[in-house]
Amino acid sequence: MPEVKVKKGQELNGLGTMLKEIMDANLKDPKKYKRIEKLKGSMVIRESTSGVAVTLHIKGGEVELQNDAIDKPTAFMEAGFENLAYISSGQLSPIIAMLTGKLKAGGNLLMLLKVSNITVLK
């Protein structure tokens, strides 16, 4: 089964470490893997209070994480720590979070929704 790779020479920040654990577990599910298998692009996830960010690079079914945000991601999302925790634990739907203003998102929203299949514990 695929595993999330970490950009060479980097040690992930706390946000990246949390997401890697969740994504590694989710990618073991063939149905969830199939949803991202053909995706190509990058996604920035940022914690708004501290500015801590990670970038996911997805291509050909492989996922790589790196610290910090890149300049031009395909999609991005930003929320406070508590809301990111609620979203990643499955207690708050990413769609509801966007509609209620708890999550800022931009770029390719379809990609965000597809990637949420592996970034949320379910």
Predicted feature residues:
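Feature captures hydrophobic
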Residues: M1-K122
